[in-house]
């Protein structure tokens, strides 16, 4: 039987749902092929944590330093970690504020939240692409990290 050794692993908005993210990253390292690349996207900036995060089952929102630390502790070599979607911060804060003012419905399914997402998608995606060129190390609604398997973890 052939062992499964992926050459690429992608986690999109998964790590923030895990109670033991470092242990999970170690498991991924143990199954990864020797030249495996790991791409992870997580919500960023703990100060933005609000009712929508809680309802979505998020344990936390990451900052760059913590995400890199978790990767290193799990045996991954971080190639790059950068924030993106800077304008989205303002929409997230507004949606969080509105969800606090109307606790009778789910923050994730609120009409105001869905309306704001549609407006953002139509008006601000282009702005986000522009601002991401200038803010990758400073701030953004999300954080992306690319890592490779540590040479000390090769089988």
Protein language model regions, located:
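Short, solvent-exposed loop/helix junctions and linker helices
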Residues: 18, 61, 137-138
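Conserved short-loop catalytic and cofactor-binding motifs
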Residues: 12, 54-55, 78
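Acceptor-substrate binding/catalytic loop of class I
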Residues: 51-70, 83-84
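A C-terminal cap/extension of S-adenosyl-L-methionine-dependent methyltransferases
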Residues: 2, 88-155
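Short catalytic/ligand-binding loop motif for oxyanion handling, primarily in non-cytosolic enzymes
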Residues: 47-50, 87-91
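Short, glycine/charged-enriched secondary-structure capping and boundary segments
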Residues: 23-28, 53-56, 94-96
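Conserved SAM-binding loop
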Residues: 1-50, 64-68, 145-150
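Conserved S-adenosyl-L-methionine
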Residues: 76-87
């Amino acid at each position: 039987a052939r062992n499964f050794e992926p050459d690429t692993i992608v986690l999109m908005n998964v790590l923030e749902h895990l109670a033991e993210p470092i242990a999970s990253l170690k498991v991924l390292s143990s199954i990864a092929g020797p030249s495996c690349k790991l791409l992870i996207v997580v919500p960023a900036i703990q100060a933005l944590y609000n009712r929508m995060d809680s309802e979505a089952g998020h344990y936390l929102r990451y900052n760059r330093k913590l995400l890199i630390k978790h990767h290193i502790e799990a045996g991954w070599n971080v190639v790059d970690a950068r924030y993106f979607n800077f304008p989205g911060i303002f929409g997230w804060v507004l949606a969080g504020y509105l969800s606090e003012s109307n606790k009778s419905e789910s923050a994730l399914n609120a009409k105001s939240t869905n309306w704001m997402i549609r407006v953002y998608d139509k008006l601000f995606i282009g702005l986000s692409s522009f601002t991401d060129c200038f803010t990758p190390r400073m701030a953004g609604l999300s954080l992306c990290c690319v890592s490779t398997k540590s040479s000390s973890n090769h089988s």
